[in-house]
């Protein structure tokens, strides 16, 4: 049987509005630090940075 694998599910949150609306995955081995992606915020009506929440 196959092992668990290296990909982990992470939740992306916005500090300005407190939104946690995006779910994505990342490779634990290649990206050990916190993930930061630019995504659309429906509350602000613009693209802002969403950071990984643990």
UniProtKB/Swiss-Prot annotation:
Keyword terms of this UniProt record: Ribonucleoprotein, Ribosomal protein
Gene Ontology CC annotations of this record: cytoplasm; ribonucleoprotein complex; ribosome
GO biological processes: translation
Gene3D superfamilies hit by this protein: Ribosomal protein L33 (2.20.28.120)
Top-level taxon of the source organism: Bacteria
Region forming the signal peptide: none
Pfam families documented for this protein: Ribosomal_L33
Entries under NCBIfam families matching the protein: PRK00595.1, rpmG_bact
HAMAP family: Ribosomal_bL33
Assigned protein family: Belongs to the bacterial ribosomal protein bL33 family.
PANTHER family: 50S RIBOSOMAL PROTEIN L33, CHLOROPLASTIC, LARGE RIBOSOMAL SUBUNIT PROTEIN BL33C
Name of the protein in question: Large ribosomal subunit protein bL33
């Amino acid at each position: 049987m196959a092992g668990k694998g290296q990909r982990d599910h992470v939740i992306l949150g916005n500090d300005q509005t407190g939104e946690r609306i995006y779910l994505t995955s990342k490779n634990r081995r290649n990206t050990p630090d916190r993930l930061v992606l630019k995504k659309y915020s429906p509350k602000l009506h613009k693209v802002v940075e969403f950071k990984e929440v643990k």
